[in-house]
Amino acid sequence: MNSHKKEEWEEISSIGSCNSKSRVLKCRKKNGLIENEKVDIVAVKIINKKFFKRNETDILEKIRLFNIPRYYSHAEDDNYIYIYMEYIEDKKQLRFKESEIISMIADLTETLSFLHKHQILHRDIKPSNIILDKNGVLKLIDFGSSIIDQQQDDGDNICKESSFAITGTHTYMAPEVKKLHRSTKKSDVWSLGCTVLEIVGGNPKKIFDGIPIIPNHVSEIMVDFIKRCLIIDPNKRSHMEELLTHRLISSMVGQNKNRENNIEPKFNNDYLSSKFPERFAPRFEKPKWEIEFNELKFNKDDTVGGDGFFSVVKKGYYNETEVAIKLIKKAHGENVTVCDTFYHEVLIISNLRHPNIVQFIAACIKFDNKEVNHCIVSEWMSGGNLSQFISNERKILEINPHLRVKILLDIAKGMLYSHRQGIIHRDLTSNNVLLNFRKKKLLNNNSSNNDEQFYDSDEIIAKVCDFGLSSNQSESKKLRGGSIHYMAPENLNGSPINEKSDIYSFGLLVWQMFSYASPNTIYSPKEMASMVSDEKLNYRPQIPFNVPLKFKELITQCWDRNPLNRPKDFSEIIDKLKDINQIYFQDNSNASTISSTAITTTISTISISNSGNSSYSTSDDSSTYGSGFYNSGFL
């Protein structure tokens, strides 16, 4: 192998730093080509000698594989080691086809299997150590943590060289490495599982019972592959060779790689992720709902439907249709947490279709470094949110009490659909229910007061919105989040949650429909959290004394401390509301039997605040728990 002196090279640009101990430069040979290589441009990894491990050059010199950058030579001076390698002109793309994703997984698994056959452990497998060249070929890089296993065993024995040092990236590190500080070939298998999980839109940091949570949208065949990697006991974990025979990739490895794959697992969604570095951000075929920002038109008066810390909702037009446009504020457009939550909401709502869930229309996902225009486009709801309606249109509810049942039925139907899709809302509040209604005056012939407005149930429709904090049922086991005043005790205490937590929040909505107050006007978030979560205090707001008995029963059952005592699901709540409707509102003439000012709050200390003219309002910043991202959900 030819040696090279650093004086023979001129720096073109910085490619980046692998860590604080090394950096990589793009360089050109000053005089001609590298002998026998026919190239004049290389990647030079410069490593501080204090942190250099001879393993890296020994391994790179030993292996020759299409999916590993070619090693040319290395040099050194008093302070640094210079490793000269093949320069990879990476392919910058952000969306991949399903078949491309499977091909990448196959390439990565085959590469790792090759290394293990030669007794090499990589020990730092993660998305940032994978790049694609300009032809889309996967390359595994950064062998700074790698070692050669001298024991020549079956892969289960521990490598002596790694016995007393943690090496790798914690998020992708196998349990036995974290606990025992020791690596095996099976440790690479765990890291592979975490990497594949992230490629298909999961988050290895979200863990339950020691194992990263696999999102519901991942296909069964992909789930099986990942699960074979993510087994806590390394003795039960698959070998790389075994993974090569898995039906997900077996027909794409070796001679079959260029043949049409007989198994084409269908992903249920397009997967979105901002966790990867720019050189390897996963990209999939552009979904039908993705649009360009210039396709949107905004109202001339720049109507604002709601303004929050991280985003703003504006009224606009898409294809000459009135829409609500929720934009991430430019100051937060590059915030990873904000963008992740945005992508998460798009992923969920783009697959929900129900009359009582705000209709998602499109989204703009702008990755241009010069300008960030992330936005969600949905139907425009002219009636504002339920919190505003309760506060500003109290008289309508008093004159038309049957509308309470209609609104609550709409919410329950939307939530039932959501739960049956495996989605837990986790932030069901009056701010996250939007209304459409027409103030069409229907004069009551029996009424002498022509100012009274009477509505048919068909005149109003309620829809659930803001799924930014939502999660699938497998992910929600120990995740906390939402508006504290509506949060169930088990959520506040960090206990496992499920759809019963949404039912608890629904109980507070029913209470709010009669008290005309918001839970957050009574106590501060900290006080409310302490009082609700405390088993002895077990605080709930006071139910007005003249609320009809059936409604009282529904409220107390929904917000029962024990989730098992709450309604089994929203279908049971719907049945109860239908029964209430028949008992109290058999016809419009009976509507007045429990109407008028008789139904008022008995809590004199509660002050009702006017939410203003905004159609999409936000709640207090401090009432949101968990990610710190939402005021009322995403806003």
Curated annotation (Swiss-Prot):
Keyword terms, alphabetized: ATP-binding, Developmental protein, Kinase, Nucleotide-binding, Phosphoprotein, Repeat, Serine/threonine-protein kinase, Transferase, Tyrosine-protein kinase
Q: Name one Pfam family in it.
A: Pkinase
Catalysis performed (reactions): L-seryl-[protein] + ATP = O-phospho-L-seryl-[protein] + ADP + H(+); L-threonyl-[protein] + ATP = O-phospho-L-threonyl-[protein] + ADP + H(+); L-tyrosyl-[protein] + ATP = O-phospho-L-tyrosyl-[protein] + ADP + H(+)
Consequence of gene loss (knockout):
Abnormal morphology of the terminal fruiting body; the sorus, or large spore mass atop an elongated stalk of vacuolated cells, does not form and the stalk structure is expanded.
* One example GO MF annotation: protein serine/threonine/tyrosine kinase activity
Q: What does the PTM comment of the record read?
A: C-terminal tyrosine kinase domain is capable of autophosphorylation, in vitro.
Classification via InterPro entries? Kinase-like_dom_sf (IPR011009), Prot_kinase_dom (IPR000719), Ser-Thr/Tyr_kinase_cat_dom (IPR001245), Ser/Thr_kinase_AS (IPR008271), Ser/Thr_Kinases-Pseudokinases (IPR051681), Tyr_kinase_AS (IPR008266)
Boundaries of each Protein kinase domain copy?
A: 9-249, 299-585
Enumerate the active-site residues.
Answer: 124, 427
Give the enzyme's EC designation: 2.7.12.1
Task: Name the positions where ATP binds.
Answer: 15-23, 45, 305-313, 326
Q: Which SMART domains match?
A: S_TKc (SM00220)
Task: Give GO BP annotations, semicolon-separated.
Answer: cAMP-mediated signaling; regulation of cell fate specification; regulation of gene expression; signal transduction; sorocarp morphogenesis; sporulation resulting in formation of a cellular spore
Task: Kindly give the CDD domains that the UniProt entry links to this protein.
Answer: STKc_MAP3K-like
Q: In which tissues is this gene expressed?
A: ZakA and zak2 are coexpressed in prestalk cell population, zakA is enriched in pstB populations and zak1 in pstA populations. ZakA and zak2 are coexpressed in prespore cells, zakA expression levels are 10 fold higher than zak2.
Which Gene Ontology terms of cellular component type are present?
A: cytoplasm
Further comment found in the protein's record: 'Zaphod' is a fictional ex-president of the galaxy with 2 heads.
- Protein role: Positive regulator of gsk3/gskA activity required for cell pattern formation and a downstream effector of carC. The kinases, gsk3/gskA, zakA and zak2, form part of a signaling pathway that responds to extracellular cyclic AMP. The pathway has a role in transcriptional regulation; required to direct prespore/spore fates during development. Zak2 negatively regulates prestalk differentiation by regulating expression of ecmA.
The record's similarity note reads:
In the N-terminal section; belongs to the protein kinase superfamily. Ser/Thr protein kinase family. In the C-terminal section; belongs to the protein kinase superfamily. TKL Tyr protein kinase family.
The name under which this protein is listed is Dual specificity protein kinase zak2
Q: Which organism is it from?
A: Dictyostelium discoideum (Social amoeba)
